[in-house]
Amino acid sequence: MIRKLKNKHSNQGLTMIEVIAVLVIVGILAVVAAVKMSNTSDYDLASQLEVVKGHLRLAQAKALSSGSSWGINFTTSTTYYMFQETAPTTPVLILGEDNATVDLVTKKSALTITSAPQTITFDAYGSPGTTTLTVATNGGNITVTKNTGFIP
């Protein structure tokens, strides 16, 4: 008869080394996450840059749908507004904004338009013209492609 040897030691727990290793790994991950979350200025610049791109695309869409020119006028490094061809000095309220003139300081954004003053106008076909336009900011450049009006 062959008897099975029973293991008298139970494997139902964790060793102290395993517990310490898990705690060290969790601690390292917590520190990395805290460092990433503490500096949100890069995320602010990137998100506000996308908002400005969205406003440019809105002006382009309005030009396409209305059959008349629309544009964005970057008046200072922190303010801009959308306008229609018939009244280029009269700001038009941008969808989702509280005021017709967008003020980046009021929005508590660190984004600044370094190429201001600058005006970008889209014709009835959504084209900015025959020249590629660049809106320079401290968060990166916004390129409006000639003829097509593509904004990457």
Pin down the residues of each PLM region:
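Residue-level detector of conserved, well-ordered beta-strand and adjacent loop positions
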Residues: 38, 123, 145
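Alpha-helix exit/C-cap motif
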Residues: 54-81, 149
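Low-complexity, S/T/G/P-rich flexible repeat/linker segments used as non-globular hinges
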Residues: 127-152
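N-terminal leader/signal peptides at the extreme start of proteins
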Residues: 1-14
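Type IV pilin-like appendage domain
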Residues: 70-124, 141
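Structural motif detector for alpha-helix initiation sites
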Residues: 16-19, 146
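Aliphatic-rich helix starts adjacent to a transmembrane/signal segment
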Residues: 17, 23-61, 65
